[in-house]
Every structure is written in structure tokens, then in C-alpha cells.
Curated annotation (Swiss-Prot):
Major location category of this protein: virion
Similarity section: Belongs to the skunalikevirus tape measure protein family.
GO BP: any one term: viral tail assembly
Protein name: Tape measure protein
Length: 367
């Protein structure tokens, strides 16, 4: 990729410019994953369409180039981190995990490109173009068994050295304890909010639902808990808050969004929910973090609300204040309802594994 301030990527037939940074790469990748998903669906319906195969091949090759570029950027950033401070250690851990994900993603893409090349050669989409995660899952199961004593180790560490535990234990454990602490803080905020709103009796239902959602998707408990807390704070019932959070998280993943993308999507959506207004600024923020999801929501809102056609476009309807949060909520739910068959990637599987371990450590914080 060029070293200038921006780079260009073709998505859905349109050339788009992105900031030449990790954030820009993540945004471009999100849009490309959404396009790849649509191309695969189209090939299931028209398995001899070699033009679609060629488009998918080009898409995957672009993703591969971006993944390699991301790995290079992460290595460069890692080399500048000061591991002598707790903040530096936390940043180093996050960057190391992101680097592993980027390199794994590149390996997966190389395999998918070979599958598509085979389909082009045969002239038929007669392959199951999903990543085989059997080996990955067995590897993760092995890691889980090796960490069966994780809780006992963590309890011992906390009792012996208290607050300095994070900097004293191994790299992986340090990251999981940090995640567990973030989850605990988010749980306390949820509990206090629910008590204040008068529905504290539903805390167990909401907290368990959010933890399960995090295990089943590429989100983490901290983000799902914070999002449900926002909805409850705005007056939603426990059931409604859980439903809205599940819809947002599942839709983000279904349209190629990562757990990191979810933070930006959730922030934009939460701000609109809090103000009760759909704004161009927040929609742009949502687009920056998940291009494919944003495009789908815009199209779905227009289809579900024929009265908006008088404005010519979704953006014009927003500018005129004609798009409500209720419209957006229903469109988000529809996007989530269509995601039940979404393929899990290696990254999603790994995110679930990290979440399992982080949640397993929660009891140690009260030991």
C-alpha cells in the first residue's frame, strides 16, 4: 500500500478513499467483508457466474493485501511501545493480540483465494467456501484444558501480590484478568443503573444474557454490558434492552464488523438513542466503523418506510428529520434476524475463546 495519507479501495463497484492508518484499514476491511458475503450469497443462487467469482477473487486479494499491511503497521507500532509502564503493557498486549489476528486472517484469506481460483478453473461454484475451523476449534479446546487451573492460579496470585498481579503473571493471563476487570466494572454500572431505574430484580437476566451474547459473538462482555446499560438508562425495559443489544451486536458481526468496529457502531447508535434523533454525524460514524451494515440499514429503512421516498435518499430524509429511532431500531432488528446463518471466522472463534477465559476469571476478583 502507498505511504501517502490515503489509499483507495473498490467496494461494491465504487472507489472509496480511506485514511492510511489502522482505523482506515479496519474500515476498508469491514466494507470488503460485507461485499464478499454478498458475492458468496449470489454465487449460491448462480453457481456458474464466473464474473461474480472474479469479483470475489479480487475482493479477497484486496483483503489479503490490507491484512498484510495491517500486520506491518502493528509491528511498527509495537516497536514504539514502552513496556515499562502498566499502560504500555496493556497496549503491548492488545497490539500483540491484534497482530496474531491479522496474521491468522492473512493465512485464512490465502486459503479462500485458492478455493475461488479452483472454482473459476472448473467454471462452477461447487465448493463450500467456508473456512474450516475444525482444526482451530480443536486447538482452542486443547488450550482450554491446559488452562483448567487458571482460576486457582489467579486466586493465588491475587492473594500474594494483590494489585500488582497484572504485571506479574504471564502475558496471556494478564490480558484476560484485565478484560475481567473491565467486565466487572461494567457489571457494577449496570447493577447501579437498574437499581436507580427500579428494575434491579432483572439484573441477573440482563447480565447473563449479555455474557452469553459475548461468548456467542465477536463482542466482549464489557461492550455488551455497557450498551444494555445505555438502553436501560434511557428507559427501556430489561427485555427490550437485551433485544436491542443483541440486534446491534449480531448485525455488526453479520456484516463483517469486528469487536473493535462494534465499539464505534455502539457509540454512534447509543448517542442517537440518547438524543432520540437520527443524525447525519452519527450515521457517518456508524458508516466509518461498518460500511456494509450502514448501507444495509439505510436501504432497509427506505424499504420499510415508503413515505420516505419523497426525500429521494436516506441522507436527505435524515437531513429533514424524517428518520426516527424507531425506524432504525426495526431495521437493525431485521438485519440481525437475517444473520442466524452467518459463518463464524477464526477471529470470531478466537474472540469467543478469549471471552470464555475472561468470564471464568470474574469470580477471582471477589476471592
Amino acid at each position: 500500500m502507498a505511504s501517502n495519507a490515503t489509499f483507495e479501495v473498490e467496494i461494491y463497484g465504487n472507489t472509496t478513499k480511506f485514511e492510511n492508518s489502522l482505523r482506515g484499514v479496519n474500515t476498508a476491511m469491514s466494507g470488503l467483508r460485507g461485499e464478499a458475503k454478498n458475492l458468496r450469497e449470489a454465487l449460491k443462487l448462480d453457481p456458474t457466474n464466473t464474473d461474480k467469482m472474479a469479483q470475489l477473487q479480487k475482493n479477497l486479494q484486496t483483503q489479503l493485501g490490507l491484512s498484510r499491511d495491517k500486520a506491518t503497521k502493528l509491528k511498527e507500532e509495537l516497536s514504539t511501545v514502552d513496556k515499562g509502564t502498566s499502560a504500555g503493557q496493556k497496549k503491548w498486549l492488545q497490539l500483540t493480540r491484534d497482530l496474531g489476528t491479522a496474521e491468522t486472517q492473512a493465512n485464512r484469506l490465502e486459503g479462500e483465494i485458492k478455493q475461488v481460483e479452483g472454482a473459476i478453473s472448473s467454471g462452477s461454484w461447487d465448493i463450500d467456501a467456508k473456512m474450516d475451523t475444525k482444526g482451530v476449534n480443536s486447538g482452542i479446546d486443547g488450550m482450554k484444558s491446559r488452562f483448567s487451573g487458571l482460576r486457582e492460579i489467579a486466586v493465588g496470585v491475587f492473594r500474594q501480590i494483590g494489585s500488582s498481579a497484572i504485571s506479574a503473571v504471564g502475558n496471556g493471563l494478564r490480558g484476560w484478568i484485565s478484560d475481567a476487570m473491565d467486565t466487572q466494572t461494567a457489571m457494577i454500572a449496570l447493577k447501579n443503573t437498574m437499581k436507580f431505574k427500579g428494575n434491579g430484580q432483572d439484573f441477573d437476566y440482563v447480565s447473563k444474557s449479555m455474557q452469553k451474547l459475548a461468548r456467542d459473538t465477536n463482542a466482549n462482555s464489557e461492550d455488551t454490558l455497557k450498551l444494555s446499560t445505555t438502553f436501560i438508562g434511557l428507559g427501556d425495559s430489561a427485555k427490550t434492552a437485551v433485544g436491542k443489544t443483541e440486534a446491534l451486536v449480531k448485525a455488526n458481526q453479520a456484516f463483517g464488523g469486528t469487536g473493535e468496529n462494534l465499539k464505534g457502531v455502539a457509540q454512534a447508535y447509543g448517542q442517537m438513542s440518547a438524543s432520540g434523533k437520527v443524525t447525519a454525524e452519527n450515521i457517518n460514524q456508524l458508516t466509518d466503523n461498518n460500511t456494509a451494515l450502514s448501507a444495509s440499514l439505510k436501504d432497509t429503512v427506505m424499504q420499510m418506510n415508503p413515505q420516505l421516498k419523497q426525500y429521494g435518499s436516506f441522507n436527505e430524509a435524515v437531513s429533514n428529520g424524517a428518520v426516527s429511532m424507531d425506524m432504525l431500531d426495526k431495521a437493525m432488528q431485521k438485519a440481525a434476524d437475517g444473520s442466524s446463518g452467518a459463518t463464524k471466522t477464526i477471529r470470531d472463534t478466537w474472540s469467543g475463546f478469549n471471552e470464555d477465559l475472561s468470564q471464568a476469571l470474574l469470580p477471582t476478583l471477589e476471592a
